């Protein structure tokens, strides 16, 4: 007798709407859904997809990284578009004139961008200015920068693994001897 095929893992998971009940986000989704359908520009489709994403997949972008990415050749006078938050970076002293569009900009970052003669736009303003995303640079924050990613990967304690172990304490007695120093068995 044959065994029937398991259908419990068949589903390909992709969001068709945001999980959030935020009415302002839902209005943006309505707008970009219209633009993605009516224009052939891939920009609108990408923005729409990113509006659906969870918060961990929309990591914050620091002002320093934004400046570094906008300094690249051919990106002057373009609008930096971030589907997420732009955060301030106190390590940066001189800020160039920037034109940015983001879901959220922290108070410090907003103040410094405007002080430098820049401009902060919302996504509905962007849709009016560039409905097809002409003259824009789509940026996103570092997704793997979260602390939890340090624990992922090859099991801690195996050769050539740099994975951070989950331990209750960082004391001398906790995962610091065997495999960490040559005098105690071996060193990775």
UniProtKB/Swiss-Prot annotation:
Keywords: Cytoplasm, Endoplasmic reticulum, Ribonucleoprotein, Ribosomal protein
Pfam families found in the cross-reference section: Ribosomal_L18
InterPro entries linked to this entry: Ribosomal_eL18, Ribosomal_eL18/eL18-A/B/_CS, Ribosomal_uL15/eL18, Ribosomal_uL15/eL18_sf
Span list, region Disordered: 153-188
Location relative to the cell: Cytoplasm, Cytosol; Cytoplasm; Rough endoplasmic reticulum
GO CC terms in record: cytosolic large ribosomal subunit; rough endoplasmic reticulum
Compositionally biased residues, Basic residues: 161-171, 178-188
Main location: cytoplasm
Transmembrane spans: none
PANTHER family the UniProt entry points to: 60S RIBOSOMAL PROTEIN L18 (PTHR10934), LARGE RIBOSOMAL SUBUNIT PROTEIN EL18 (PTHR10934:SF2)
Subunit structure: Component of the large ribosomal subunit.
Protein name: Large ribosomal subunit protein eL18
């Amino acid at each position: 007798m044959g065994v029937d095929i398991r259908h419990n893992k068949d589903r390909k998971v992709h969001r068709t709407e945001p999980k959030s009940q935020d009415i302002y986000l839902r209005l943006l989704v309505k707008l970009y859904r219209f633009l993605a359908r009516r224009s052939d520009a891939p920009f609108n489709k990408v923005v729409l997809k990113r509006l659906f994403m969870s918060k961990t997949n929309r990591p914050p972008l620091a002002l320093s990284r934004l400046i570094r990415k906008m300094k690249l050749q051919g990106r002057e006078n373009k609008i930096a578009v971030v589907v997420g938050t732009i955060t301030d970076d106190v390590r940066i002293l001189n800020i160039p004139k920037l034109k940015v569009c983001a879901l959220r900009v922290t108070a410090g970052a907003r103040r410094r961008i405007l002080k430098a003669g820049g401009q902060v736009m919302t996504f509905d303003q962007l849709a009016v200015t560039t409905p097809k995303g002409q003259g824009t640079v789509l940026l996103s924050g570092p997704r793997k920068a979260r602390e939890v990613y340090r624990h992922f990967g090859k099991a801690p304690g195996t050769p050539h693994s740099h994975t951070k172990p989950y331990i209750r304490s960082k004391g001398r007695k906790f995962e610091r001897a065997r495999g960490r120093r040559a005098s105690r068995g071996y060193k990775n």
